[in-house]
Amino acid sequence: NIFYTDLDNTLIYSYKHEIGKAKRCVEIYQGREVSFLTEKTYQLLSELKKRIGIVPVTTRTMEQYHRIDLGIGKFRYALTCNGGVLLVNGEREQTWYEKSLEMVESSKTELQQAARCLERIKDRTFEVRLIEELFLFTKCRHSQIAARQLQENLQLRFADTLTNGEKLYVVPKVLNKGMALQRL
């Protein structure tokens, strides 16, 4: 038996979210405590890990994922970069990654067009990044408006826009957590 779970806003929460006083820090970034886990979630995960495998599935990059320490030991498998990167004992599994690159090939032109459009967005508050050659990421004050503009202007067929607060992603349709779980 395996328990697949997202991390952010499912198991862990940023300092911006109030989750009560019974919590523990699970991520430090640039000397600041930035992500937390409730004590109850910690207890449940600790018990669960003794019984079955747990596989985190996240849009986080490998670097961002490695900053997290839930306090229950490392996981044998994790899916990062929205399922585009499989980690086995903390290391990227190269065959999986190469297959992910093949899968997103049909989206490359749309990603390039989207990057050019994102560069011109005036309320962007962060650089436009191509994450692991798989998808785009940036931050905008009005990410939902920017996502709608991208969809209307580019008529995306092979990629989707996703928003989470000020975060904006342009992700190939074939690169999603559900499909990654099927691959695994």
Q: Each predicted region: which residue ranges?
A:
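A short local loop/turn or secondary-structure capping micro-motif enriched for an aromatic residue
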Residues: 21-22, 96, 179
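Active-site neighborhood of HAD-like aspartate-dependent phosphohydrolases
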Residues: 1-3, 7-56, 66
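Conserved acidic, metal-coordinating active-site core of Asp-based
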Residues: 114-184
